[in-house]
């Protein structure tokens, strides 16, 4: 049975392995810069756990994916260039989503779970992250424009999906 739950400290080794696999996958697929060699940092992961926004996806008790999710907004989403968000309603944000090597469907499962939590999701990704862009398109996300990361760390393509009422 597949389920999503909050991250626990004992999940860290599995998460680190998943993040390492994700970094290698990105490099192999023409996206060496988005996560580099050390992203996400341990400090980021610890903060996500402390703020209860770090989650893991388990399949038959094995961790197959991890992500950060919050409905507290995202400061870098206040300004968007070359487009506009679909609405100004409260939204959830997904960050640092990664699936274990060889896992199929886990990222879609996680994204769908997030949508079930609030019905309005915003997410951003690197221009070179074609696999993620493909997943977002497959799941029905709309490209909204470009956002700028904090501290001049670059730009990201911004997407949104909402439950139609």
Predicted regions and their residues:
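Conserved catalytic-core motifs of GNAT/GCN5-like acyltransferases
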Residues: 124, 142-156
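Conserved GNAT acetyl-CoA-binding A-motif
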Residues: 117-128
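Conserved active-site alpha-helix within GNAT-family acetyltransferase domains
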Residues: 128-145
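Conserved acyl-donor/pantetheine-binding loop and adjacent beta-alpha core of acyl/acetyltransferases
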Residues: 68-102
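Conserved beta-hairpin
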Residues: 52-69
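Conserved acetyl-CoA-binding loop-helix of GNAT-fold acetyltransferases
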Residues: 99-116, 133-138
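Conserved GNAT-fold acetyl-CoA-binding loop/helix
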Residues: 23-43
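A short beta-loop-alpha structural element at the N-terminal edge
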Residues: 3-17
